[in-house]
Structure formats: C-alpha cells, structure tokens
Amino acid sequence: MAAPPPNDGYGQYPPQQYGEQPQYPVEPAQQAYGSPASPPPAAASQHGAEHGKKKKRAYAAQAFEVATGGNAVVGGQPAATQYGIPQPAAPGFGGYPAQDAQQVAYGAPTTPYGAPQPAVPGVGGYQAPDPYYSQGVPPAAVGPAPGGVAGITAGIQSMGFGGQPQQPQQLPAQTRGLVNQLYPTDLLNQPFNVAELELPPPPIILPPNSSVTPSPDANCAPKYVRSTLNAVPTTHSLLKKSKLPFALVIQPYAALHDLDDPVPVVQDQVISRCRRCRSYINPFVTFLDHGHRWRCNMCNLTNDVPQAFDWDAAAQKSVDRWQRPELNHAVVEFVAPQEYMVRPPQPLVYLFLFDVSYAAVSTGLLATSARTILDSLDRIPNADRRTRLGFIAVDSSLHYFSVPRDTEENGETSMLVVSDLDEPFLPVPGELLVPLTECRQNIESFLNKLPEMFANNQSNGNCMGSALRAGHKLIAPLGGKIVVLSSSLPNVGYGKLEMREDKKLLGTSKESGLLQTANSFYKSFAVECSKNQVSIDMFLFSSQYQDVASLSNLPRYTGGQTWFYPGWNAARAEDAVKFASEFSDYLSSEIGLEAVLRVRATTGLRMSTFYGNFFNRSSDLCAFPAFPRDQCYVVEVAIDENLTKNFVCLQTAVLHTTCNGERRIRVMTLALPTTTNLADVYASADQCAIATYFSHKAVEKALGNSLDAARDLPQQKLTELLQTFRKELGGGSMGGGLQFPSNLRGLPALCLGLTKHVGLRKSALIPSDIRSAALCQLSTLPLPLLMQYIYPRLYSLHDMPDNAGIPDPETSQIVLPPPMNLSSERFVPFGLYLIDDGQTQFLWVGRDAVPQLILDVFGVQERTQVAVGKGTLPELDNDFNERVRNVIAKSRDHKSKGVGSITLPHLYIVREDGEPSLKLWAQTLLVEDRADQGMSFQQWMGMLREKVVQ
C-alpha cells in the first residue's frame, strides 16, 4: 500500500516519526531510509541557549556513547551491549551522525556530568501537550516543514504538538472526507518509544459544521471521556471483522476539587431534554422552525425549545442562546430543579470504624488515624455546615461514642460498649452522628483522648462485620460514607474470615480461589448498603494475612475504594507520612452523593457492559452511594443497527448531590465520526483506551474465572488484532516483519506489562493480599495513572539534559528527563535511575556510581553508606541534588497528568550491589526484561509473530 504524503491528516505521524529526533539536518539518503520528519511533542531547540549559564558538577559518564547513555537516543536505539565494553560506532539513527565509541574507564568522565551536553532534544522532557481533540485541519495548513531542527519544531507546532494546548478547530468545508491516515509500521524493526504513551489520542475528525456553535470545546476532551475508536464502524459486522473493542473510558472528574478543574455550570434550572430518549440538549443538536424546536442528535425526535431558554429570569431580560454553556461546551453541569430529587439533598456523613485491637494500637494505626482526622477537620467539606461525623471503635466488642454539642455545659463524650454481636442494638442514634460545626470542640477533645483510651488494649478480636452492620443501621436513614481503618482479620461476629493464605497454592491454578470472596456476607451486605446510599472505603494495614479479596467487595459494589498498606508501622516516619498525607487528602476530597450514571447514544448503539466500582441497578443505570473523583469507568458499546449518520454521539450523565447539598447533573457529550472503511477504524484507534479496556476485562476474568484466563486475555486479543491487520490491511506477508498501525505501536508493550503486572503475573512469590489490592487498582485507576502502573516510567538521572529538573521558563513546570524503555539494557553500571509506577518509586544506584555523584545526591562519601529501602532524599545544598528531588516530586504530581489522586508513592533507594530482594522487586518493574517466569519483550514479540504467521 502506497505511503500517504507525510503530513496528510492533522496530528498524524509516519511510523518512524515518534521519538527519534534528528539533531542536524538530515541528508537526503537518510531521509529516504525513513528517518523522521518530526519528533514527538518536544520543542527542545530553544534550550540550547540555557547551556552555558551555570557551571555544573562534573561526574563520570559514558553518557554520549550512542547506545549506552540513558538519554543519548530515545526511539529506535540499538540495544546496549555488555556494560562498559567499548562499542562499535552506532549507525546514524534518525540522522544522528555516528559517534566514535570511546574507551572509557568507569570512573573517568568524558563529558562532565551534567555539564553542557551535545544533548539530544529531550523527548519526554516536555510534558505532552494537553490532549485536546481536534475537529480537523485542512491538509494545506500542514505544509512540509523547512529543514533542520528549527524547521522540525515549526512543523510540530503547526501539527499541534507544541507546548500550548491545541484547541480543537471547526472544520473548514473544503476538507470533507478528511480522515486519520493509516501508517503501517513494522513492530520488529521500528520499536515503540515510551514517549508515545503520552501523546494525545488520534484526533476526532468530524464533518464540517457538526456542532451548532463553532466553540473549540464543543466536543468532549479526552481527560473526561475517551473512546477506543475515534472513527466508529457503521455496522456490527465491520466492528466484528476489525477485532477492535468499542468501549468508552469515562472519568467524569479530572481533579479532587472543583477549583482545580472548573466546568461551566448552568444555574437557571432550565434543562432541555429529549421527550423520547431523555438526552440533554448539547452542541450537536439541530435547531428547526426558526429556533423554536430542536432535533435530538440521539433519536431524531423533534422537541420544543423551552420558553425560558432565551430568557434570563434573574435579570429579567432576553439572552443570546448561542452563549448558553450547554451549546458551547461538551462538558457542563446543570443545577437540578426539584423533580430530580427523591428527598431533600442528604448531608455529607462520615462514620469512622476504628480497629482498636492490639495490632492496631501497637503499630500506631489508631493514634495516627485519630491525629490525621483531628488535623483535617478544617479540610472536610462543610460549606453548608451540615456535615456529620460518627465514631465506633472495634475489637471483640463494639464501642460507641456519644459526642455532646459544644453548647452543653460540662459535656463529656461518653462510651457505650456492646458485646452482643448478633443483634448489636443502637444506643441513642441521634447522639452518635453529630454535626461537625456544632460539636467541633468536643470532637477535637475526643480525638485527642481516643488513643489513650485503648493504649493498653490486649484484645486480638476484630468484629468488623458486626460493626459494619451496626454502622449501616446507624447511617442508612441519611446515607453517607463508612470509613474502615483496620489492621487485622475480622475474626469474630458477622462476616468472620479465616486465615486461608496457603503458600502451596501460590502460582498454581488453584490460586484464583484466594482472590475470590471467602464469605458471601461481604457482597450481599454491600448491595444492601448501595440501596440505602451507604458507601464503604477500606484502609487496610495488616502485616499478616487480611483477606483483601473478601473485604474489597465492600467498596467494589458501593462506589468506594480499597487502600492497602502492607506491613505498615507508624514508627517508620515514611509510613506515617504516606498514610497521613493520603488520608488527609481523602477527607478533603469533594465527592458526589446519591449518584447515578447513565450513558445514552445515537440510535443503533447500545451500552452492553459496565466495569468499575458501583452497583449495576438496571441494564443501563450504575448506582453510586458516593461518587469518588479518582476512579475511572469503562463501558462497552454494541452496534445493534447499521449507523446511517456520518457521526454518532455518546452522552454520559452523572446525577449527584454535591458536598454543599446542591443536586446537579454533570453531562459529557462525545461526538465520533462513522466510517465504512476498516483502515479508518484502525488509524483512529486509541491504544491507551484499548489497554484500559483490556485491564478491566482481565480483572473481571481474574475474579470470575481464573488468573490463567486473565493473563491469556491480553495476549489472545492482541494476536487477533495483529492477524486481522496482517490479513486485511498489511498487504500480505510483508517478509519477516510484524505489521501494525503506528498509532497502536505501544499496545504490545502495554499488553506485556499487563500480563507481567503484580496483579496478574504467574508467580509463586506474590501474597494474595498484594494481588487483590493490585486488582483493585487495575480496575479503578484513571487512564494516565493506569498506563504508568502497567508500563512504569524510567528516567536516567545521572545524564539528564540540562533543562531537566528545573522549571520550564514558559510554563514554570519542572521538566522531566525523557522517559526510557523499561529494559536493563538501558542501564549503565555508573548510572542513577528513577523507576516510578505511580504507586511506588525506586531510585536505582549503579554498582559503579562515582563518589562525587553519591556525595551530591545522598551526602555520604561511600556508596556502601547509602541507606537502602524506604527513605527520602536529604536536602543538600547543591544544584544536582535539587534537580533530582525536583524530578522525583514532579513524577509524583498527579495534577499535571490531569487526574485527581490521593496517592503519595513511597521512595525506595536500591543499590545494585545491595539488598537482593529489594533489587529483585525493582527489577520486576522492568517490563521488557525476562523475570520470574515472564518473557522479555523480544521473546514476546517473537511469540506474537509466530502466532500471527500461523
């Protein structure tokens, strides 16, 4: 198939283009070989000027030998050979002149460490642009770029990969028929570069004038809703033939607080909806009859425009309807009138269940929890002053606390102990859930005293099941959140659990049984809670077996989450800080209450399956007693009838009560073009959304079938895609290669990362609690965090570019070094590396790291003096230490990824010649290496090729 012209189709890139940046003008001969016409989203050229400003410290490095320096080349690098052995000069990759390999003694610097470098422009050094969708740009707008780096940068900026967010544009009429170009690539010869995972999805190219206003925000941004297909097949048979999944990845909130991610709010309570399908009016409807009526873009019914639609009741004057938010913005929030409420909006209610058994007291869990709640009372949402709190302590009995109002004279908090666990009665419910505002002082004094009350508790009993039933009875009339803080296995009363971890089962086909619930109480109780608008969050801290598999059912069906802190102990400062920070952010997060989510779509499309933490109340309604802001949901879409329109719409609506007691509906409308052409479907497929769908599907298999079935799923689906592409679009056999579209080039690495993930990989060394907690993350993490969890980020720090670790002059955001592929072949023995999967960070110190590096980063003379394990970097007065700390902090920054999260990852310091088990753990994150029964990336690709050729 003839290659299309290089820049045809906005935002498209020929296969080799990602990540191999020419540093010098490319000679024609090399250009013909297929070297890139433009690099990924880095506008690195202007940073040359920064080089001479500050004299940097000199450290040893072979940094600039083409194949060994971690940041020397990113893209199709040749694999590094044996550590430290001189290498043959590498070919000029992507137009780099070949460099002479110099023989270097480990310690001897060739180029000073961190000094001005003939550095490659940092690929991932700039954050990828805000991934907006585009409604297309005429080909003429993307002319051939002039030569050289400046030209390439200009070319990139015209393609919308510059530093500024690319605003979607209304499509000019002459570009009708513009589609994403299909660029086949050979997976074996044009390796994937990790920077591609941060690129925006293929643009959504709609027909001209699809929306009623030319607003750049008329279509939904990918941070809220992403489709696995940005061009939808018109028939079920074409979708089936493609073997691609059609699903939406939905994350209604991109931050924990509204202020961090405001969306337009329609305050006037005029909500225009279709009479038949109940869709909300949106930018893709059509107005008829001089604007008095509108045609629904989902079911085609004609509806009347409400009279108040063009009238501002507050100001008593007519308004310009074209300014209304719901016609200009795909994501809006309507303030709901009375008919959207079953009862008055509920207040925010938190009921804390404290484990006060010996385990919880001795590890410091009780004291740290009480202290954190005390310190966070001002952060708990309470703008309407209706927020209520309640406290129950749990060992082999239930301890209720009745907190008096601050106005009561000599008001003392009283404790009531109930030992009858079969029918725990509720003493004085009115005094157990108290308004935060009216009882603030007494709540503070209670939290101060709580740890002392149980300081000498020797009980090992934990009747958490009975406590949950009592708590449910207490808050069911109002609804709200039950927050469980537990560090032992529930072993008495309702829902008691046995120690069932059996090392002999790990790594065998029977292991899956350990991931399923051991007591039906947890699932049936969770469904009961969901009906009464009660959500449960679990914070689990055991150093022993805790049966996370059973306990995680409670959050799974009530819109909650499970947080697991294995081996946690407050005596370790890092443990105490991590939990206190996460728990405080959790308490401060805004949540929706009494929420339901529904997805409607153009006639012919049907929502077939829903994945995520909620209860599926009917075929298309998902119920959330509380709606969190740090989770995503996946909805599979079926094509039931042939699609006749040239674009379809999918509208997600979340009806909820805000923390301030206001009933609202958040509406997100996504429009996608349709196509009859298989090549268009493949060219517009979104690899990150597909990997997210596979992740949710694999977790469902792990919990419902077996771990083997879960592991096989990504491999089987990927093989089907490769076979289909080869047969239908690959032009036959194509010699020894493995053909796939360039926009899906990262999918094999993501699928390998998923099968080797701690939640799924075959191993006899993974405790079932660790596995169960990982499955909770794999099925809830927002897409950007999930990609990093499956395929972690690896940064080389000892030779990072000069602009890394310092603020970008334009955005003032810290610049990260370019990410590297997860292979130990990229490591040099004198290197310093950061491996980060978003939950845990590892700082890897090479076995030959030079003393100056050790001194500057850790403040000690000898490598052997570097303390390994959980830790924090000392703040030292030198440039390089500050840059390394900045990179570690920036890598943890969720806001810059466009998601809300409370997670504060632990940092583990790993010496290559240090603690073997720690080193082994860090190495399991190197997805492309062979480890613990898992194959290397090369073996994986070889196996896929064999399966495809068969």
Curated annotation (Swiss-Prot):
- Which InterPro entries does this one have? ADF-H/Gelsolin-like_dom_sf, Gelsolin-like_dom, Gelsolin-like_dom_sf, Sec23/24_helical_dom, Sec23/24_helical_dom_sf, Sec23/24_trunk_dom, Sec23_24_beta_S, SEC23_SEC24_subfamily
Q: Does the keyword Transport apply?
A: yes
Query: What is the superkingdom listed in this entry's lineage?
Result: Eukaryota
Q: Write out the annotated subcellular location.
A: Cytoplasm; Cytoplasmic vesicle, COPII-coated vesicle membrane; Endoplasmic reticulum membrane; Golgi apparatus membrane
Please tell me where this protein is predominantly located.
cytoplasm
Is Protein transport found in the keyword set? yes
Keywords annotated in UniProt? Cytoplasm, Cytoplasmic vesicle, Endoplasmic reticulum, ER-Golgi transport, Golgi apparatus, Membrane, Metal-binding, Protein transport, Transport, Zinc
Q: What does this protein do?
A: Component of the coat protein complex II (COPII) which promotes the formation of transport vesicles from the endoplasmic reticulum (ER). The coat has two main functions, the physical deformation of the endoplasmic reticulum membrane into vesicles and the selection of cargo molecules.
Any idea what this protein is called? Protein transport protein sec24
Query: Source taxonomy lineage?
Result: Eukaryota, Fungi, Dikarya, Ascomycota, Pezizomycotina
Q: Which gene encodes it?
A: sec24
